[in-house]
């Protein structure tokens, strides 16, 4: 949160400066116009002592890096959370919480960001960290490659080298904790390794070891500080609780003085992490040692219900009031298949008319679900939900439901008093390509330009757009098509740099969404394994549930990501197949096998599920019979027009069609197969003259919209994804491609 200082004299001077700087044509001076506003309004909650949402605004380096997401995007106030939070409540409570800034002051921030967010070195409040020691870097590289002989030689020559400054200030010893066994860690400590030397993120070796009981024991026996906390507020206890099944480690840490209830951001609380992991045993341990559910935050309640862990819910359900259950109800309605959890929240007094920061009600979420949860919609209506409520974009439950076609939910809403709405389709100019070659060649430049534009404007890699473009470029190259290699290299570099900024957070169990997608995309572009990919792989392994699957929690009901456990499991497994750290293959092989086994029995509810079940089983290469059955089920949903739809009540789309075709081909379906050829005809007939395919978004907005130069306005992001899948499917069928063939049982 952004908090206001009361400094009337200074404020008067700043208002004068703000008025001048608010003029659109005026050049904003950071020191004169922006810095005083930051100091007065922001530092209490985002300064040296407190960093709410892991965001610190008093230093240039941390401000530009952002917190849990990019906050300042130079050149684009429209995609900068700082400006959006200051200017209104579209994406959270308007800041500062004590009262909005004046329009002139808000304009200062807007103009400063749009002019490039210049922040002079003299005012950066940063002390550039010393460069990594060359010897330390060589030691780290030896560790990650499994070259124990070279590493041990360095240690034998100079034991003090264990504490040298390596990448991001992390010592070779810290990396030894990641890449070596417990016996080696013990030996290195005996040689003088410092267990408490922090890196640039204030993380210590104990935080990196927190998922390994033997290493944790050894470090504490050698004096590691059990309650040390990183800049993000995470302790070893919070990191340990992130992984399901961590009770032995959590118990050991608690017995050795770990604080179960430290003050700080609620998402760093160990109890919150345990609830998100669905681990009742760990939650019980924490509560027995003094953790307080309220201190862990209301999201802890939502997390426990979302994981469908009944014991987890029982442990904390009496700690929260109706207000907390109202928030949980909104969160749960995103995953509207949680009927029992939604009923539980209502039974505890949740307000069915509750809204989130974007004006979205539980009914808006439920009506928007691809799973068509009629019982949930009826439950909410029966308890008084407003069938004509609108989110901040003016969308009603009926509008969102009709995006999924004429369904029983549409009928129920109309019977319950929803005002009729007509969804107008845009005027589209189709231009059927005469050949696959011409269709693919029209699409490639548009995809590349939009891809790099998204990365530059958003400051993040998106949840799947970047990866899909990477996969598309790899596919079309193999088929003999030309791409802009300079632009492609720039995009891959940007993605890698983004994850480098997140590397230490990944070690601590914190990550942005879609990391598995990103690794699959990087591999498609032949990105070599390094410390960054190791960190992402470690995070992915940490988040696997004991039954082998990966869940997906997110803040909006957007297909195909939210609640899509099959797709996230398949992609996570694939990412680990590509980038499992070389020193831990046995551990990761088990993780991959568990994922493949889970996919065999996973029930597919949508074509997104069916598609990724085919992908996953093909990648697992473990159960041919299950793969054949999954292919048969996906083929059975092809429409008469040759396309596939997201769900049966919707029309065919290039997204669902291209995705299904690529998956089937990956599983062995030849492009000469009649079903594949029908898909080709559908895609060729639905491409637009600008080279794109149009897909109408059927989910509520999550990110602030901005134009990346792709057609179709506010539908452009999903249209770009659909264009990627369509382009891949066509490129695979081009004359230059030599497909694998397989017999498919129908």
Which residues make up each language-model segment?
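Aromatic- and Gly/Pro-enriched helix-to-coil junctions and flexible linker segments
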Residues: 20-148, 153-157, 167-171, 175, ...
